[in-house]
Structure formats: structure tokens, C-alpha cells
Amino acid sequence: MHWADATSEKIMKKRNAEEYVVSSGITPSGHIHIGNARETLTADAVYKGMLKKGAEAKLIFIADDYDPLRKLYPFLPKEFEKYIGMPLSEIPCPQGCCKSYADHFLMPFLNSLEDLGVEITTHRANECYKAGMYNEAIITALENRLKIKELLDSYRKEPLADNWYPLNVVCEKCGKMHETKVTSYNSEDKTITYVCKCGFENTVQPFNGIGKLPWRVDWPARWNIFGVTAEPMGKDHAASGGSYDTGIKIARQIFNYQAPEKMVYEWIQLKIGDKAMPMSSSSGVVFAVKDWTEICHPEVLRFLILKGKPTKHIDFDLKAISNLVDDYDELERKYFELIEKQKTEELNDNENEKISLYELVTPKIPERLPLQVAYRFCSIIAQIALDKETQKIDMERVFDILGRNGYNPAEFSEYDKSRLEKRLYMSKKWASDYGENLEINDFEQAKEQYETLSEEQKAWLKAFSKEVENIEIDANTIHELMYETATKLNLAPKEAFVASYKILLGKNYGPKLGSFLASLKKEFVIGRFNLTE
């Protein structure tokens, strides 16, 4: 059983609710990266597991856009220093293209969720507070402030001040909330008095967006408001004495609500060279979800995140994304093989888990096994078939190349062609930005490389080019011919490969050579390998 199915089953047995609400959330203080997406996709996986079991369930996303800007992040202009302490929803867009700072970072993520196959109801904290959804919770918190203080102090080394109030007020003059302080609360007329460092002071009812609960009180309050029964959380929140531990007690003792079941997830680390660093919007170590959808299929991101348990950390290497796509393609082939097998045989647990995983990570399952052209090979084809002037890929050239590599384009469905074209453009961008950008040597560069070769390698190049004149060029024939001609001349095949890569790419290595040469025009291959003429 896949972990998402097991988790949803466990939650349903424990809660036995009429409706299950699975929640996810993020503070849009910077670029929302694939590490953040792990939370939302984990929630989505468990939600889908509940639906599969026939439960009434819904998936919600809470955007904490009423949190303040905490500091001047490295990606912000200096003039944004004046907005520190203001709610993210009230700060202008840093690039002037969106309604607010929060929207600038939030909207690309929300738009990408549809591509990722996530159907979710979004609640923006600023709208919820302004609409009065938190008013009752604010009153409850203020009237129980000493009890909340006692609960929080039991986890703190230094106790909160005796005059602490569980409320952050948005100053009505300067708009900041990090420099205000509540000095008193009147339970009769439900007003608070606050002062701000800007010099402003007022007595006001802290409702409809005037006041916001601090995180450790806001979180359990929202569980009650939205009826949350399950929620993924990072290991920092789930740590002993963390906000989940205090949230359990505040939810039960202050808001009379049972805390949701927790699903703890590990970080996704971005691998750069030999180092792997946790992604962080504030530090700038990010790979945004919108960036992913430009270089790879959304279902492959779901595969990366959902194939293993949430508690397993992931090292994500952009340079190795082709290997990840290969793994997804292998799962896809296995899925269709098992769908046929189960018509006549009973599948074992491992096989059933593969079916569950593919169905979970693939939002739109094709009717049959679609065309699969390896991602890395697509990156090569895309660069060869690219029209440099229009920057469009010549699909007829692509079909010609594939025909010489064992494919039959006449059998491609419209779905096959569409998916292939998407993979070509995505893999081309990946190769350009993160992978191997294929730059074939011009004639003069090839001549320079030719002069660095041994006499045996030069002789092989000439012999090979002569043989190519007499064959129909395709990947397998080319591969076999390289070995045959090298063997005849007593040249180690490895030396023949090195010679080929040098005159073509100026390197000692490169893509799979048979497929690469079959992707090029026959006349070009003959001319490039016979540089003596």
C-alpha cells in the first residue's frame, strides 16, 4: 500500500469524521519553491487517498499573506526597507506587475497548482481577517490571555512579559504591525488600547483586520475556523516544543477543538555541485515551482515528491533531471504492463503499489502507453531541429530524426505529438539553462580538434566516413559500424568515440553517439568525419 493510502486510512480510522478537511499553507514572503510544494502535494496525496476510500473530503490552502515583511530580503530593492513590518498583502509589488507583494509571489504558485493536478480551495489570511472570520477567535484569545501565556511559557526558557497580549495590531497610521504594542483590553466593549513606535495611540475594537493573532495562536484558531482534520507540516513545526505542540494545547483548552492529525515532511535540498542546501525563499536558495513547469512535466514533480515517504529528505539535482524523467517513464511502462496483467492474474503488493503511485502522480492518465522519447535525447533533438531565427523546433525534422532512431512517426497519435513537442521545448530549456547545451563545432573548430588526434584516430575517421556513404543512416547501424571500422583498424572503440566527440563538440564525451549521429544529416556526418578532403 502506498504511504498516502496508508496515511489517509489511519487518519480516517482515528477521526471518524463526517467530512475531512486537509489543509496546507504558505507565507508568500518570497519565491515559492518546490520544497514548499512538498507540503501541498503531500496534502493533495492524502486528500485523494480519502476520496478513493469514498470519504467526504476537501482540500484547502491558506495563504498567510497577512504576515508582516520581516526583513529586507536579498532579492528586494533597498527602498523596500520602509515596508518592513507591514502585512505582505498591503505592500506594493516589487516589480510593479501585480496587485501586491503577496500576489507577486503567490499567484505563480497558485497558477501552477492546476498544472500539478491539484484542485484546492484557497483562503487568503488578509481577506479572512478583514471579513471578520477571526473576530470570535480574537475575543477568545484576549479573554484567555493569561491561560495562553501559561501554556506558551511552559515551553519557553524565558517567560513572556506579564503585560503580553496574544494580538498583533496593524497601526492605523503607519500600517505596520511589528512596532505596535497592546497595553490593555476592555472585555465589556471588546476594545484594546495600543501604542505604536510611530507615535500613534488609539483604543479600538481589534476586528476586521485591525488585529492579527500571533502564529502560535493563529494556527490553532484556524484549525477551529476551517474544521481542519489533517495537515502536513515541516519538521521545525513538529519538533518537541514547536508550534504544533503548543497548538494542540491551545486548540483544546482555549478553542475547544481537537488538533488535526500531523503529517511531518522533510526538506527538499537543492544540490549544487557536491553540496546540498535546504531551499529557502529568504536566503535565495530556491527553485520555484513555475521554473519547474518550464523545464519538465508536472507529473514528474509529483513523482519526485510522492514516490517516497514525506519523512525522507530529497536531494534535488537539476543536472540529473533527465534521470528522474527516465524513472517516471519506466513507471509509466510498468503501469500499462500491470494493467494488462491484472486482467488475468492477481497482482502482488509491490505491483499494486506501482499502480497506485502512477495514478497518484499522473493527473490525466492516457488511454494507452504513450510515445516515450528519452528526455535527454529530446534535449539533443530539440537543439538540432531548432530554427535559430524563429526559435521554433522544426517538427518535420524531429520526425525524420526519430525515424532514423527506430521510431515510426506514422504511428504517433495526436496526444503523442503534443506530449513530444512539450518535452522537446522543456528539455531544450533545461539543456540551455542547467544541462548540456549542445554546440556543434564549426568547420575551423573541428579542424583544430582534428589536429590534436592521433594518426590512428584520423585514419579511423576517414574510413568511417567512407562507410557511411554506403548505408542508410540510423542509430543501430551507426553504432555497429563504429565498432566494426575501429576493430578493422585495431583502434580501441573508446578512442573512436573520443575522436568523434572532439571533432563534433570539442569534448572527450557527449550524448549517446549512435543516436546523436543519426540525428544529424548524412551529408554533414560524412563531411565532418572526412576533414582531409
UniProtKB/Swiss-Prot annotation:
Entry keyword Aminoacyl-tRNA synthetase: yes
Q: Per the record, GO CC terms? A: cytoplasm
Protein name as it appears in the record: Lysine--tRNA ligase
Q: Where is this motif: 'HIGH' region?
A: 28-36
As recorded in UniProt, its EC number(s) are 6.1.1.6
Q: Read off the InterPro entries from this record.
A: aa-tRNA-synth_I_codon-bd_sub2, aa-tRNA-synth_I_CS, aa_tRNA-synth_I_cd-bd_sf, Lys-tRNA-ligase, Lys-tRNA-ligase_SC_fold, Rossmann-like_a/b/a_fold
* Positions of short motif 'KMSKS' region: 278-282
Q: Which Pfam families match?
A: tRNA-synt_1f
Q: Source organism's superkingdom?
A: Archaea
As for subcellular location, the record says: Cytoplasm
Against HAMAP family, the record matches this protein to: Lys_tRNA_synth_class1
Keywords assigned: Aminoacyl-tRNA synthetase, ATP-binding, Cytoplasm, Ligase, Nucleotide-binding, Protein biosynthesis
Q: Which gene name does the record give?
A: lysS
The record's GO molecular-function terms, alphabetically, read: ATP binding; lysine-tRNA ligase activity; tRNA binding
Q: Which Gene3D superfamilies match?
A: 1.10.10.350, 1.10.10.770, HUPs (3.40.50.620), Lysine tRNA ligase, stem contact fold domain (6.10.20.10)
Show the catalytic activity.
tRNA(Lys) + L-lysine + ATP = L-lysyl-tRNA(Lys) + AMP + diphosphate
